[in-house]
UniProtKB/Swiss-Prot annotation:
Organism, scientific name: Pseudomonas fluorescens (strain ATCC BAA-477 / NRRL B-23932 / Pf-5)
Single GO MF descriptor: sodium:proton antiporter activity
Keywords for the protein's UniProt record, in alphabetical order: Antiport, Cell inner membrane, Cell membrane, Ion transport, Membrane, Sodium, Sodium transport, Transmembrane, Transmembrane helix, Transport
Descriptive protein name: Na(+)/H(+) antiporter NhaA
Described function: Na(+)/H(+) antiporter that extrudes sodium in exchange for external protons.
Length: 395
């Protein structure tokens, strides 16, 4: 009962967050295509400086959101992954097989489609990872519109798949989207990680020391050339889940505290800051460029083929079973919903094509918004139709 109650609360929060993300993205599109566009762009380009002694970090507001606030989002992802691995849906190998296979297919096929369409354009190939991402809040938000017509097992399947997908995105960012490395900063970051691990081993359960060293780690990683958001994941993996004296779990306490701030503050703010695509000069021909086409087709078709195809193979070979109470039509609908890349795709896109420094910076958003929109609409329609059929057969 506690597990179901926890999942219900989590699902409700993710669903509400998904709807808020949609509103934030629509608002950004409206403002950036109105007479107030100067205010929108001027606000995001506002320089913000943080200085302590000789240490100075100067970035426009947009990068403080993408590098700073999103580190808290990745901290939350890291906490969720650690909890799921130690005592949740990822704790038993048998529970990982189906969503794990689906997640792998959902990353490989979109990347291959994007590569195929852009193989003759080396600068554009830097965006290969953009369509590999799934926005868990947005996808669960759409699925929530179907209510009890969708079995809980299918919602758990989507949630677990998305968590594994997020873990894959973390690995991709660490390996493929890091800049020129600073040896000194990496050494200092290593010292911070060593201190965090030592505190974990010594049984330190107070969150304060972890957060202070985590902030220092973020600065070191930011200066090192590795993307700063990875500091959040590293910090999460060092926060203890269990305690020796039956005290409240530090990991669960931090996860509980962060969740509403990330879901209803950071992610909508990120969507508002990054989804404001200017439609000036955009024509139907713009969507035929291989970058937006590769992203949109990768999200809509690549995710569907990859997730559904690997799920079908896993079930037909007998290494996994369909989620209890679900039919193949519902699985197909969920596979299509996995093509809602949105915030995660926008984030990877900001790394692949930096705003203001790449000719593809606007094109990637065209592909992300188009692919995500069609994935949401078609995925909802397919899942709804399959759920009606399932309920009819059951009655």
């Amino acid at each position: 009962m506690p597990l179901r109650s926890t999942f219900t609360r989590f699902f409700a929060m993710e669903a509400a967050s998904g709807l808020l993300l949609i509103a934030a993205a629509i608002l950004a599109l409206i403002i950036n295509n109105s007479p107030l566009s100067w205010l929108y762009n001027g606000l995001l380009e506002t320089p913000v400086v943080a200085q302590v002694g000789a240490l100075k970090i100067a970035k426009p507001l947009l990068l403080w959101i993408n590098d700073g606030l999103m580190a808290l989002f990745f901290l939350l992802i890291g906490l969720e992954v650690k909890r799921e691995v130690l005592e949740g849906q990822l704790a038993k190998p048998s529970q990982i097989v189906l969503p794990g296979a689906a997640a792998i297919g959902g990353m490989l096929v979109p990347a291959l489609i994007y590569w195929f369409l852009n193989r003759d354009n080396p600068p554009a190939l830097n965006g290969w990872a953009i369509p590999t991402a799934t926005d868990i809040a947005f996808a669960l938000g759409v699925l929530a519109l179907l209510g009890k017509r969708v079995p809980t097992s299918l919602k758990l399947f989507l949630m677990t798949l998305a968590i594994i997908d997020d873990l894959g995105a973390i690995v991709i960012i660490a390996i493929f989207y890091s800049g020129t490395l600073s040896t000194l900063s990496l050494m200092l970051a290593g010292a911070c990680i060593a201190a965090l691990v030592a505190m974990n081993r010594m049984g330190v359960v107070k969150l304060g020391p972890y957060m202070i060293i985590g902030l220092i780690l973020w600065v070191c990683v930011l200066k090192s050339g590795v993307h700063a958001t990875l500091a959040g994941v590293t910090l999460a993996f060092c926060i203890p889940l269990r305690t020796r004296n039956a005290e409240p779990s530090p990991l669960k306490a931090l996860e509980h505290a962060l969740h509403p701030w990330v879901s209803f503050g950071i992610l909508p703010l990120f969507a508002f800051a990054n989804a404001g695509l200017s439609l000036s000069g955009v024509t139907l021909e713009s969507f035929t460029h291989h970058v937006p086409m590769g992203i949109a087709v990768g999200l809509l078709l690549g995710k569907t083929i990859g997730v559904f195809g690997l799920t079908w193979m896993a079930v037909k070979t007998g290494i996994a079973a369909l989620p209890s109470g679900a039919n193949w039509g519902q699985v197909l609908g969920v596979a299509i919903l996995c093509g809602i890349g949105f915030t995660m795709s926008l984030f990877v896109g900001s790394l692949a094509f930096e705003p203001g420094s790449s000719e593809y910076a606007g094109m990637d958003r065209m592909g992300i918004l188009t692919g995500s929109l069609f994935a949401a609409l078609i995925g909802y329609a397919v899942t709804a139709a399959a759920s009606r059929r399932n309920n009819t057969l059951a009655s």
